[in-house]
Amino acid sequence: MDAAAEMQKVVSLRRGGGGSSSRGAASMWWSADNGVFSRSRASSSGEDGEDDEEALRWAALEKLPTYDRVRRAVLPVVEEGGGGGEAGKKVVDVLSLGPQERRALLERLVRVAEDDNERFLLKLKERIDRVGIDIPTIEVRFEHLEAEAEVRVGNSGLPTVLNSMTNKLEGAANALGILPNKKQTMPILHDVSGIVKPRRMTLLLGPPGSGKTTLLLALAGRLGKDIKFSGQVTYNGHQMEDFVPQRTAAYISQHDLHIGEMTVRETLSFSARCQGVGSRFDMLTELSRREKAANIKPDADIDAFMKASAMEGQETNLITDYILKILGLDICADTMVGDDMVRGISGGQRKRVTTGEMLVGPANALFMDEISTGLDSSTTFQIVKSLRQAIHILGGTAVISLLQPAPETYDLFDDIILLSDGQIVYQGPREGVLEFFELMGFKCPERKGVADFLQEVTSRKDQKQYWMQHDKPYRYVPVKDFASAFQSFHTGKSIANELATPFDKSKNHPAALTTSRYGVSAMELLKANIDREFLLMKRNSFVYIFRACQLMVVSAIAMTVFFRTKMHRDSVTDGVIFMGALFFSVMMIMFNGLSELPLTIFKLPVFFKQRDLLFFPAWTYTIPSWILKIPMSFIEVGGFVFMSYYVIGFDPSAGRFFKQYLLMLAINQMAAALFRFVGGAARNMIVANVFGSFMLLIFMVLGGFILVREKVKKWWIWGYWISPMMYAQNAISVNEFLGHSWDKVLNNSLSNETLGVQALRSRGVFPEAKWYWIGFGALLGFIMLFNGLFTLALTYLKPYGKSQPSVSEEELKEKQANINGNVLDVDTMASSTNLAIVDNTETSSEIADNSQPTQRGMVLPFAPLSLTFDNIKYSVDMPQEMKAHGIVEDRLELLKGVSGSFRPGVLTALMGVSGAGKTTLMDVLAGRKTGGYIEGNITISGYPKKQETFARVSGYCEQNDIHSPQVTVSESLLFSAWLRLPKDVDSNTRKMFIEEVMELVELKPLRDALVGLPGVNGLSTEQRKRLTIAVELVANPSIIFMDEPTSGLDARAAAIVMRTVRNTVDTGRTVVCTIHQPSIDIFEAFDELFLMKRGGEEIYVGPLGHQSSELIKYFEGIKGVSRIKDGYNPATWMLEVSTISQEQALGVDFCDIYRKSELFQRNKALIQELSTPPPGSSELYFPTKYSLSFLNQCLACLWKMHLSYWRNPPYNAIRLFFTTVIALLFGTIFWDLGGKTGKSQDLFNAMGSMYSAVLFIGVLNSQSVQPVVSVERTVFYRERAAGMYSAFPYAFGQVAIEFPYTLVQSIIYGIIVYSMIGFKWTAAKFFWYLFFMFFTFLYFTFYGMMAVGLTPSYHVASIVSSAFYGIWNLFSGFIIPRPKVPIWWRWYCWICPVAWTLYGLVASQFGDIMTPMDDGTPVKIFVENYFDFKHSWLGVVAVVIVAFTMLFAFLFGFAIMKLNFQKR
């Protein structure tokens, strides 16, 4: 075969895969971390016989053409039976490697990631270098980058209902040039220039808000349109337009977005499959060709690894297994990732999945944003070390931002970029950074991590403590001065010189920059998405089974309501009942499609992330989500039609039966496509619920059943022709009424038309057989249209927008001053309102030494209290999974008799590895456990602990900071203080106290900031932590528990939080913190340590001592324990030397050693002493359980709910807006029909307007209130546990706040619709109409709340509540009037709230009209005979409607009081 033909065949083998991302292959697939070459050498030097045999196999392999050779490898045959021995060698096709073979290969190459990865990568590099192949590299240059965002300043940025409306109008006026733009620009990056070199690890540091994420996004070519950006970023001298940056570089976000129902392995495999292999295949073919020419035989295992990693289209790739191993995810590879609803992996593991998702691809440059959040320092160290090996050996480019890098992790980096207030303060080699700051007059203290020092040295508050030129007075050095000084520093000069010389493009490797948009062919991407969608459908099978069952239940109800023995064919009225049954069937099939909304929306954040990373185009995602649902439609619709068709007594012809089934299939598919499109266009659950209900409403009302075609106004007739429901209703009606059952001619009929034709004409349906096929064809057209629109929406729309950023005026001034280099005076300086604390910047140990608790005397006095606990045991029922593994005990013990004491003015750290029981112990002591078995004694200052009184004197700062999202910081504190301080504290003292607390925790500049939802809007993680502490402090507690107060924070933020904690202790309070991996200075801010080991036992309880001397002395005194190195973090050392593996190595039990120590005896004596009440003391006593009276609790809860509702435009503004729109639509659709009473159809039309409004606006209220109540409920659990209020005042606040909003909604709707439809203008009739509408909207809202109260989450609530909407719809009296309902179902009409509403509305409007209709019957008599609605019953109806409202509200309150879905 000639070379050209051979290369042609090789290219075809790649199946359309990824153009020129050559370095991608070579670097990032390796850039994970395994690396073993320890065993691979052994395998190539076996016995002579084996060598000969292997040589023959290699010779045979060499003779193959390149096309076949790159697919085959020589591998050992693993013996069966798990012995692990080798039974000779064989040639295998790398595309068909099984999981066991892949595992065995990896095990030989990289047995232990920490030890073997580097050796493995060096082997790879050696093989590539041996034949002289260059690995592509990328140098990223950025020059004069400027970025700024438009923000609203002050209160105009708060998302109130009023602001949202005025801001929208203002935005429109700005766009038209009528009004000037009131937004101000906030600088994010300012004149940022630099170079990121290949084969070097760059660490990006900077305090929060310094612009790190923006810089990383700019370098990766991923900045959004909402940020104004200038400057240029080049890769190897090429502008961004010359290649595809999203595939050349990988940006790893700080947000973990994954599909919870997929396992870790499936998530990474899908990512690898979409990203393709880049240039690995090109490199491999060239490598193979050169080795053959040079007669070089590669190492068999390395050869197999490279070949298996270079093949596209594999469902599971060897690279995935390799990355899993390096990231330490192999232990949870087959565990679900999990989310709010599905239990899954831990937060730290989820963070690693986010990293792994990009590492499995072939990108050449990595930009990684805060990849260490939630990871302990040893895991972070291991991951960064593996990345470093890959970058150094295989020529990658990496910029990584980390929050609190430990000193050993910091030392792994080559270069540092320090960013502050959007300016580069330093960029260059790690070794030169301290020299630069010493020139500026600042020195890093000995026991301080350099990374922590760098984050703090530019900050206004922290700078002073590092000033070393004591002969000169200190003055604040602004960021601008640092930035300009760096320009004249030797490192800054050399970077400027290098930037002045353009990059030599001739050095650019052709494979370095990727020019193809996607990694593999479109068909391959479609296959990958089909496989994933099928997998998710299997995992979500419960939803589909539930949906099918729900349809069958509705079908069973429908067929017993429209029972064939009660269904006659004697008059046109009977035809109307049959048509009602058909309408109900169509409607239920339509409603069934609604469940596509949440299924679509929950997957969208992950979809948008993957689309923007160019994993796949939108159509490869939308087609599988449509096609794979078709078989489900067959089952769901089949169950419905097969059950009900003959029982209801539709036309018995088999042909008509199957035609109805076919039509129902089309309706089901059309509905699913419609709601997928609505979900894709709305991208937010609340908006989608409103928009989806709105679309359904328009299609229903204009579908020809609620309002007949002849009565549709000429200005709305277009709506009739484009409503899918019209085609469905017409087709299904024609199919039924043109059948043999309906072809009789009535004796009293004036025409020769059959009964079926007359029935069709009475409802405005075209009585021609062709309308079945017209309807069916139209539905197919709508299916295509909605699926097409869904695809377009997902192709072009951005993810749902976060709320408009808003900043305080002080914050903006400070930001601008820092960039301009101005020094702010103290009065306007946002961050320095609390000068007492600014001066308090000595190191923590100095604070501890100088502290005088009385000096910071808070406004309010409190009683210092101690807490002791003796022999505390805690156990839970043994989980079923553990019993399944053969464990016979009934209980699992989590705490095994721990004892200790916490004292006033002493700060205690509660530490231990994951699973040691830190949070469990804290929950037990604080009384926060909702289940399990507790034994042992707990005393408070010598008296037995009673939870009711203890809750009043203690505070608990939870790890996940739960607060009401729509209130400001100061309002959160005011609410907490109002409910928790004694009632004798007057409002002025309370305000002073809140001010003092805000100063203590440095929240004054944020007083008017909205709290927001974590990760979505509002406060940053660190600010939320401080708010959590402040919310507990304003209760003036004596004892405070804090769970992980510094997790997820950068070094500076952690220092601020610890300063807050220290200040709190110095006021004489008792404070206990669980803490994860603290830095030296955070660890040494504590006075005492309570150290636990896995299994819930204590191994050290005692003082830390100066520079942790007591702790070090204790552990070094244990025989065999290695001594601590100079400068090493005592916290890290202590955790390392006390692990279970260390215990086994030394043959000791640290718990036993502690219990035999003198320290233990001292602690026992202290517990004994503190467990005895001091003379003259008395037990804690409060006359009432809560500090406020019941009435005041109700007022406080109502005040907070008022703020929450006023600032929730997605709920309230949209609700009022859509009510107005629906009112105007109904007014124009049913224009002037209210006064017409000539025909029965006129009454049906008027009733149709009432029925539609009640059902649709009611369901809209019910569905949209659920997420709001659900968010507030999680806050309620925390606040109730803190003893702030009882359940009833909370329920009262949540219920009462709905009244004004629902009243406004009812008045808007009532006035518009009543006047436009033309009902009779009498005061009584109008107020009855308003009365019934108001209470109906209200009971629907309370029904939605009740559903949330009774279920664990609002997803479950929406499924449960939607089951009842269909039944209420059927028994409302519109589809089938009450007298026609079979006797066995008539009882339900009396307990159906919608039936009572329609009773009230129809009876109040028409029940007293004596005007005769066309056939001579007075309207009043027709209403009484046909509907059984009596005007004289209006008073009873009103009472029943109010009773339903009260019942649902009461059930919500009862559920909140009695049910607790929080498991602790």
From Swiss-Prot:
Domain ABC transmembrane type-2 residues, every copy: 524-737, 1192-1406
Family, similarity comment: Belongs to the ABC transporter superfamily. ABCG family. PDR (TC 3.A.1.205) subfamily.
SUPFAM superfamilies: P-loop containing nucleoside triphosphate hydrolases (SSF52540)
Pfam families: ABC2_membrane (PF01061), ABC2_membrane_7 (PF19055), ABC_tran (PF00005), ABC_trans_N (PF14510), PDR_assoc (PF08370)
Topology class, membrane: Multi-pass membrane protein
Entry keyword Nucleotide-binding: yes
Location(s) in or outside the cell: Membrane
Native source organism of the sequence: Oryza sativa subsp. japonica
Identification of the protein by name: ABC transporter G family member 35
Amino acids binding ATP 1: G206, P207, P208, G209, S210, G211, K212, T213
